[in-house]
């Protein structure tokens, strides 16, 4: 009987996505994110999350590794990478880390019990790939395999990115998805009517995972996934650029984004903790963008900029 090794960490919610990516990059074959806020919170019309959702500070992330993996080495690597997150302004809190072995069938089923179809926006619902789901009138379904990597698409930064895409896409646009991760934003863009989507990620694992998730969804042949370092070397003009990544990285792509976004086009930036907000705003304004929408969920922020004169607004709570 094949066995797997389970590595569980408990971190502050704001470090959830970054910590999940670290576990994947250190060789995990899948992650489970156990966060009650994903399912207990009510989401308002414009993406605001009610206060009770943010009361639980810590989340538990479980990663699965092959029996042959050297968990002593992996544990040391994970600890080192988690410590580096503070350099990006992310507070991990008091990290707790445990390991155990489990049988193949337990690994295959354990993470599935955490996931169920989740309505994210007015039109978009994320559905685990193994679930039989009856689509409602007007509902657009994004199929994901959360066992692969990068969570389920229900993190506040992803939710706000999806709300923003729903806000700006009208059909026929070219979209660039920077740091695509699971590919969820690219799939959503296709479902919302974008003509062509170009998705980039520096991590080869993310490129593979994104393509696998894209292939789960019908009509996504208009999504092209390749490895890339932000927007460096890209010459494609886009109606919309979306980036859900760390704030320190976002500030490095604003000039290239302004070069690539068409007039009257949009730049959507998410993954911004409140203490880094001014830094991102300054970088985008310096590049020439005007703020159109500011969404807030707890300590997380998402910004929608336009390449034109605009009136700024704030959504959230």
Swiss-Prot record:
It catalyses: L-lysyl-[protein] + 3 S-adenosyl-L-methionine = N(6),N(6),N(6)-trimethyl-L-lysyl-[protein] + 3 S-adenosyl-L-homocysteine + 3 H(+). It is found in: Cytoplasm. Pfam families: PrmA. InterPro entries: Ribosomal_L11_MeTrfase_PrmA, Ribosomal_PrmA_MeTrfase, SAM-dependent_MTases_sf. S-adenosyl-L-methionine binds at residues 158, 179, 201, 244. It comes from the Bacteria. Methylates ribosomal protein L11. Belongs to the methyltransferase superfamily. PrmA family. PANTHER family: ELECTRON TRANSFER FLAVOPROTEIN BETA SUBUNIT LYSINE METHYLTRANSFERASE. This is Ribosomal protein L11 methyltransferase. The gene is prmA.
